[in-house]
């Protein structure tokens, strides 16, 4: 186990030139494509952990309507395709989940729309 940790430490500390040399050796002698090897070595364990933890779906949570409650109700109504009463109930019941399972760009867009209307919004 100690040998593997030492090996991992050496991989993480490689320079760009050394990574390129390693990629060449892996391709020529072992048939491993250099792009996959270079990415794996250059990323290191910290970057790999961060990529694994990055979420692919987000929930948009309305924390509060703020001072412009009417504008927020209208924005929620439009964004969710709800009736006026349902949108008002959602805003009145804050904190509440406006939409679940959105892609990051969709969630950011909805968050921006609601914040422009005056709401306090959080992505989870």
From Swiss-Prot:
<dbReference type="InterPro" id="IPR000206">
    <property type="entry name" value="Ribosomal_bL12"/>
</dbReference>
<dbReference type="GO" id="GO:0022625">
    <property type="term" value="C:cytosolic large ribosomal subunit"/>
</dbReference>
<comment type="similarity">
    <text>Belongs to the bacterial ribosomal protein bL12 family.</text>
</comment>
<keyword id="KW-0689">Ribosomal protein</keyword>
<dbReference type="GO" id="GO:0006412">
    <property type="term" value="P:translation"/>
</dbReference>
<dbReference type="InterPro" id="IPR008932">
    <property type="entry name" value="Ribosomal_bL12_oligo"/>
</dbReference>
<dbReference type="InterPro" id="IPR036235">
    <property type="entry name" value="Ribosomal_bL12_oligo_N_sf"/>
</dbReference>
<dbReference type="InterPro" id="IPR014719">
    <property type="entry name" value="Ribosomal_bL12_C/ClpS-like"/>
</dbReference>
<comment type="subunit">
    <text>Homodimer. Part of the ribosomal stalk of the 50S ribosomal subunit. Forms a multimeric L10(L12)X complex, where L10 forms an elongated spine to which 2 to 4 L12 dimers bind in a sequential fashion. Binds GTP-bound translation factors.</text>
</comment>
<dbReference type="GO" id="GO:0003729">
    <property type="term" value="F:mRNA binding"/>
</dbReference>
<keyword id="KW-0687">Ribonucleoprotein</keyword>
<comment type="function">
    <text>Forms part of the ribosomal stalk which helps the ribosome interact with GTP-bound translation factors. Is thus essential for accurate translation.</text>
</comment>
<protein>
    <recommendedName>
        <fullName>Large ribosomal subunit protein bL12</fullName>
    </recommendedName>
</protein>
<dbReference type="InterPro" id="IPR013823">
    <property type="entry name" value="Ribosomal_bL12_C"/>
</dbReference>
<dbReference type="Pfam" id="PF00542">
    <property type="entry name" value="Ribosomal_L12"/>
</dbReference>
<dbReference type="GO" id="GO:0003735">
    <property type="term" value="F:structural constituent of ribosome"/>
</dbReference>
<dbReference type="Pfam" id="PF16320">
    <property type="entry name" value="Ribosomal_L12_N"/>
</dbReference>
